[in-house]
Amino acid sequence: MTLKLYIGNKNYSSWSMRAGVLLRAFGIAHDEILIRIDGFDANSTFKTEVNQIGATGTVPFLIDTSVQDGHDQSLIITDTLSIVEYIAETFADHPIWPKDRAMRAKARNLCAEMHSGFGALRQHCMMNIGPDLSRAGALIWRDHAAVRRDVARIETAWADMLALSGGPYLAGDFSALDAYFAPVVMRLKYYSLPVTGESQT
């Protein structure tokens, strides 16, 4: 297998989840290697393992053993957005991004916004798939206007994309955009944050 995706626990690592969802959804063959996150200090097992591989000290990262990086090493692609773009270029026969130029630009815009924005939702609704966090979600929703603004912006963006594409996914067919917002769906679900009927589907 030439592609190796190194991830943290996808129950807690939203960025790992995004990359994993994308590769699985398009049936792209890869080995998935879990690095247990036991902390982020320099002496943690996580940092030690990641730094030994030569990445940036974060997950996910993708190694393509079929490509050299110019230093006689396998190519390492760090950061989820870079991984998405690398996969889109490498597997151009897969519709990683929408075919329509305008829709593709809008999808990239939203991925970039997700990449750098929605800080309140990330901060107060930590990624945690499984437990019922509805009581915590109710308090977060009550006490943090910034979270409410983030969710409102997400709902507006989703509604706009669905109106333009006709669904069933955000840009019509499944794309990187859906993989990017998959962890947001998990946060909305497990924290039971109020959303409209359209967002619930």
Predicted regions and their residues:
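GST-like domain detector, emphasizing the conserved glutathione-binding G-site
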Residues: 1-141
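GST-like fold's C-terminal all-alpha helical module
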Residues: 114, 118-201
